[in-house]
């Protein structure tokens, strides 16, 4: 980025509040399975795709989600409690099946 006549690095703008249609599209294309486990939701993706899905989850700003951890093909979604994990799991299952509103 050029600023004040000098070239330098800049962080990308933070995109917040991913629209539900974007979340649904990413989940339809990249998610293989979703499973609640206590206060976690475990999401499986094809190899190398977990980070892509994790970014969209982080941008979704769901209040039930405390945070995400992404590996190569697995995402752990930490929820605020087991009830919240069930809510998030149901919402993400709906996104994966194209029924998210």
Explain the meaning of each model-derived region.
Residues 96-101:
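Generic C-terminal helix-cap and adjacent flexible tail
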Residues 1-2:
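A short, conserved structural fragment
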Residues 16-95:
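Non-DNA-binding regulatory cores of transcription-related proteins
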Residues 5-12:
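Minor-groove-contacting beta-hairpin "wing" of winged helix-turn-helix DNA-binding domains
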């Amino acid at each position: 980025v050029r600023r004040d006549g000098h070239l330098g690095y800049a962080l990308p703008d933070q995109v917040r509040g991913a629209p539900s249609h974007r979340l649904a599209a990413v989940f339809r294309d990249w998610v293989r399975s979703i499973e609640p486990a206590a206060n976690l939701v475990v999401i499986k993706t094809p190899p190398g795709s977990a980070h892509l899905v994790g970014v969209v989850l982080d941008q979704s700003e769901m209040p039930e989600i405390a945070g995400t951890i992404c590996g190569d093909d697995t995402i752990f979604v930490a929820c605020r409690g087991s009830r919240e994990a069930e809510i998030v799991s149901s919402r993400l299952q709906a996104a994966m099946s194209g029924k998210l509103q």
